[in-house]
């Protein structure tokens, strides 16, 4: 099992992302969804632009990564382009573990 360790901004605690089925860029987006200035993705959606900014990816690459996460059933996006929200499905949230 591939586990990526990180500290979640909103909890301040060490957590793990189960990354067996994730690319390096998908890992960046998933962790950025936990570590952004607006909302912990575990509590609901957050602005897509802040996930993109915190991932370090270009907007074009970010959109492709999000499409891949959607196809895998881990994420979804709502709203119109430029004002969209990024959120995780229950399956996506289950990739995050505290231990």
Regions found by a protein language model. Name each.
Residues 1-20:
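Long, low-complexity, charged/polar intrinsically disordered regions in eukaryotic proteins
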Residues 35-36:
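Short helix-capping/turn signature of helix-turn-helix
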Residues 39-54:
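Short acidic, hydrophobic short linear motifs in intrinsically disordered regions
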Residues 70-80:
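A short, conserved structural fragment
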Residues 80-99:
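Short, cationic-aromatic polyanion-contact patches
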């Amino acid at each position: 099992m591939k586990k990526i360790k990180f500290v979640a901004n909103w909890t301040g605690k060490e957590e793990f992302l189960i990354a067996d089925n994730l690319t390096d860029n998908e890992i960046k987006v998933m962790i950025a969804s936990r570590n952004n200035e607006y909302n912990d993705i575990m509590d609901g959606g957050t602005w897509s632009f802040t996930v993109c900014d915190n991932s370090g990816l270009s907007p074009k690459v970010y959109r492709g990564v999000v499409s891949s996460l959607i196809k895998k059933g881990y994420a979804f996006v709502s709203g119109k382009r430029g004002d969209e929200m990024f959120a995780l499905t229950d399956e996506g949230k289950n990739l995050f573990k505290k231990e």
